[in-house]
């Protein structure tokens, strides 16, 4: 039996993690949950899974939840509450499925407590990849990726020598605007971008998918997860989302991980690793697949991918700037306050306005994150 803490249990990855646990009660037990402010959803989760502790980020919502459930479970709030969930003594695995850089500090604290990390919060490695890897090595902690692409690569690397990698090939669905003309994308609204063709994801990730920023962030994540240089990481658009990613070795043979586009697959693999257990997801039937297609990403239509590569090449604090700017701009786009192409436009401006430096601790990164968020708000408001 593995004890699971979930950071972000009411979001897309969190609820699908609970579905995996629900299907395997003999293998997994929930000991801690957290949410931003959806107390109705987390109250239902409390009644079903009986955790020891629950964190609600917004203090007022936490107080309301505590009044509702009485002394059934300890309720905490704020970043301190997320840290309590991440470092709970009884937890074996911490699923980091919160969205954005808010996941950074709890993830670091979980690593320092020796917890296995099932990483779904890609921003943690985007912002502080080098620091996270050092902490994981220092505390002998394993980071198991939950993103479908990185889970695929992780699986393709099993039993292989990482030094024999020729390149990593990340697949991208192409997002909601894959077949749109650039002039039409200019006038797109949030509801258009949220119509993802293959995956069921949260709103922020779905917008990032439409801009290809999600793939850019995944390139940065792969750089640190697998210790592979940037020039060995390629992106290819694969609309069917059946080949989840591939690894090419120095003999030019390619190993791919293939399966139905269902996030419960990589989630379950991360929880059960190194074992494989029976799954309830759809079984892939090759007789029903007419074609698997691949194409190069269009970085003219989707400049966010190039910006992500550029920020990683520059390194230092620049990835933190790119990430923080993108998070704020996606919020503005979801609120219909800016256009779709304002996202890369203002990210590029923020990168130009920033003079990157070599950071030594998390507080410096948080300072950069605060700076870029305020800078973006000043430019737009």
Swiss-Prot record:
Pathway involvement of the protein, from the record: Isoprenoid biosynthesis; isopentenyl diphosphate biosynthesis via DXP pathway; isopentenyl diphosphate from 1-deoxy-D-xylulose 5-phosphate: step 1/6
One matching Pfam family: DXP_redisom_C
InterPro entries with a match to the protein in the record: DXP_reductoisomerase (IPR003821), DXP_reductoisomerase_C (IPR013644), DXP_reductoisomerase_N (IPR013512), DXPR_C (IPR026877), DXPR_C_sf (IPR036169), NAD(P)-bd_dom_sf (IPR036291)
Cofactors required: Mg(2+); Mn(2+)
Entry binding sites for 1-deoxy-D-xylulose 5-phosphate: 122, 148-149, 173, 196, 209, 214-215, 218
Chain positions recorded as Mn(2+) binding sites: 147, 149, 218
Catalytic reactions of this protein: 2-C-methyl-D-erythritol 4-phosphate + NADP(+) = 1-deoxy-D-xylulose 5-phosphate + NADPH + H(+)
Enzyme Commission code(s) on record: 1.1.1.267
Annotated residues for binding of NADPH: 10-13, 38, 121, 123, 202
Molecular functions (GO terms): 1-deoxy-D-xylulose-5-phosphate reductoisomerase activity; manganese ion binding; NADPH binding
Gene Ontology biological process terms, A to Z: isopentenyl diphosphate biosynthetic process, methylerythritol 4-phosphate pathway involved in terpenoid biosynthetic process
Keywords per UniProt: Isoprene biosynthesis, Manganese, Metal-binding, NADP, Oxidoreductase
Family named by the database record: Belongs to the DXR family.
Function: Catalyzes the NADPH-dependent rearrangement and reduction of 1-deoxy-D-xylulose-5-phosphate (DXP) to 2-C-methyl-D-erythritol 4-phosphate (MEP).
Name the UniProt record assigns to this protein: 1-deoxy-D-xylulose 5-phosphate reductoisomerase
Species the sequence originates in: Alkaliphilus oremlandii (strain OhILAs)
